[in-house]
C-alpha cells in the first residue's frame, strides 16, 4: 500500500482527491485477505512534531495516532456516525445532552481496563484543548452517573455534536486518567490508548514504530469506514519520515514501502502505469486561511471578500495539480455526499471579477501593505498554488510576501497569530 494524494481547493481554494499507492502483493494475499505478521512500512511526507491527538491536526500525525487511539464514536464510509468505544448513544431532543453507554472489558495498552473516569477525564481535556472541543463545546459538562455511562451536556444545542466527537482530525481520544493527570496543555507524556496498535518508539526526524496490541478489543460488526471490526494483521507498523517525493515514489515502486504518502501530482501518470502498485483516491479540502485574530484581515471583511473576487480557482487548481482527474473546483466545505453539506453563498466562489475586487479593495481601506503568506514545498501543490495566488493578487494591487517553510513550521506558526496573515492548507475528510 503506497500513498499518493489528490486534493480539493476552497477559499480560497478547490476540492481535490488524495492519491494513495498500494503495493500489489506485498502486504495482502491474492484473495485480498490480510496476511498475518511482518512489518508494514509507510513513507510519510512530513515530520511529526506532536503525538498528542487532541493538539495536532497534521494528517501525518493523525493517520499514525488513529492506530493507537480510539474515540467514543467514529464515522462510517458514508459519513454517518457509529459507536466505537461506546456501546450505544442517545441524543436528547434539544440536542444538548449526549449519553454514552460504554463497552465493557476494553483494555488500555498499559493493561488497565477502561473506566468511565478515564472517559470523563479524556473528554474534559478534549473540550479544553482541541480546536473542535474548545470551539463548539465550551461550557459543557462531562459526568458519569454510573460505572458504564458518560453524559456530556452542552449549554447550547449542538445538532452536529456527534459528528464533531467522531471527527478524525484532532481525535477525541480516550486515554487513561493517569496519563491525563500527568499531561500538560502542550502534550501528553505517555502515548497510551485502546487501539489495535501500541506505541513502541519515536525517533525525531526518523520514524515512529507501533506494535500490535495483543489484548485489543475490537468492536463487533462488519468493517464500515472506521467502524465495525478492526483486526490488526501486521506485527509492526513503521512510519518513516521521507520528505523527498522522488524517494517516496521510488521506494513505493521498489517495494521498500507498502504505503507512500502525498506523492506529487506530476508523478500520478508514472504511478498509475505501474503494475506493482495501486493508486487509490481519497477526497480532501484545500483552503486559503486568513488570520482573523491579528493583522490586516482582522475585522476587515471587505479585504477578505476582495481576495475571493480576485481569485480564479480553476487556474489555481490547475497550477497545483496539472491533471484534471485530480481536482475539481467546488467551494463547499464538505463533499456533496455529506449530510453536513451547505450550498450557501457558493455563487461567489470561483467567480473572479477584477472590477469588483478593486472596488472592494478601495472600500476595505487597504493601504498597499505587504501580506505575509505562508506556504510549503513539503506539499508541492501548496507551493505551486501559492505562486499562482500571488500572481493573481498582484494583478489587482494586493502585495504578498511568500514565506516558504517546512510543513511542521507552518503548523506551529498557525497558532502564532502575530507571525502571518494568510496561509494555504488542506484537510482530509477522513
Language model feature labels by segment:
Residues 197, 325-363, 379-382:
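Structural transition elements
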Residues 20-23:
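C-terminal motif of bacterial Sec signal peptides marking the signal peptidase cleavage site
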